[in-house]
């Protein structure tokens, strides 16, 4: 049903109807959704097909966020202002919603502590260079780190009101995700050269003082870094590592946890570690009560 709706709806989209396309479900947004959908279905050739519609001339670099150039010199307020703008080529679909996410993701419960920031953002990577995120990592309090991405805008109930609602503008689909989806699909199609090409395009915008002569990724470099003789296993790990760092604190990691049945492990400040196993039914959201009243069975718990 989802696939049928996707394909039929895609043919009906007319981008000319929108003065600000990125606030609407355009063809590019539909193609991005298709890459995510077919990745879950393991129809990898279709992932590559739809991703390539977004990069028709393989012009990946010009459509990725310029983290190691333009973004590098921005203040955190400027980053917050730019990350979710409709003029940012990397944003394919932006949606506003009432949320306190922007004020909470730098806090204790949702924060990135020193151990995790070292593991995800600061540890060595296959290029041999330093991720640019090191230089845009800010502290939100003791042992809480964040990268300025999605900012809050507060809408008052009236001009003179002291109360209102917090909103955020969320990038639901981005060119970075599309690129990673294509790279992952090419791993399983055993198109390792294509995987490496995408990762090199990405790395050229994410490595501090990037130099092709020093930081170019090769299949041999991947095997050596991940200590494997299996090109596919190494390439998949490289894709996952870059993707994890790219979307830190955005929630995109959840899709990978689902596809690869990875347990969720959360150390707590008090000491105990909380684990959500790969087969735990709590990993599936509960059916809303309204739907239950309509006769839809709830998910097991």
Residue ranges of predicted features:
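Eukaryotic alpha-helical solenoid repeat scaffolds
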Residues: 107, 111-112, 167-170
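Short Lys/Arg-rich basic patches
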Residues: 120-124
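Acidic/polar-rich alpha-helix caps and helix-coil junctions
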Residues: 1-101, 125-301
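Charged, low-cysteine interdomain linkers and short loop/connector segments
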Residues: 111, 118-119
């Amino acid at each position: 049903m989802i696939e049928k709706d996707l394909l039929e709806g895609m043919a009906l989209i007319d981008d000319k109807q929108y003065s600000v396309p990125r606030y609407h479900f355009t063809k590019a947004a539909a193609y991005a959704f298709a890459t995510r959908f077919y990745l879950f279905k393991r129809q990898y050739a279709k992932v590559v097909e739809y991703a390539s519609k977004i990069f028709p001339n393989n012009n990946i670099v010009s459509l990725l966020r310029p983290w190691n150039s333009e973004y590098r010199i921005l203040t955190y307020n400027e980053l917050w202002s730019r990350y979710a703008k409709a003029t940012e080529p990397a944003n394919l679909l932006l949606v506003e919603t009432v949320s306190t996410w922007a004020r909470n993701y730098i806090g204790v419960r949702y924060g990135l502590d020193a151990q995790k920031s070292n593991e995800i953002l600061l540890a060595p990577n296959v290029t041999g260079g330093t991720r640019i995120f090191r230089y845009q990592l800010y502290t939100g309090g003791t042992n809480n780190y964040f990268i300025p991405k999605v900012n809050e805008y507060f809408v008052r109930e009236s001009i003179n009101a002291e109360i209102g609602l917090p909103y955020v503008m969320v990038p639901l689909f981005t060119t970075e995700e599309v690129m990673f989806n294509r790279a992952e699909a090419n791993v399983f199609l055993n198109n390792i050269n294509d995987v490496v090409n995408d990762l090199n395009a990405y790395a050229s915008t994410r490595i501090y003082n990037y130099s092709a002569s020093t930081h170019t990724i090769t299949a041999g470099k991947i095997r050596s870094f991940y200590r494997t003789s299996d090109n596919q296993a190494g390439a998949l790990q490289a894709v996952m590592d870059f993707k994890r760092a790219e979307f830190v604190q955005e929630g995109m990691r959840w899709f990978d946890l689902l596809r690869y049945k990875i347990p969720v492990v959360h150390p707590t400040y008090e000491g105990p570690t909380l684990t959500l196993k790969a087969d735990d039914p709590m990993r599936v959201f509960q059916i809303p009560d309204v739907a239950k009243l309509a006769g839809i069975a709830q998910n097991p718990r």
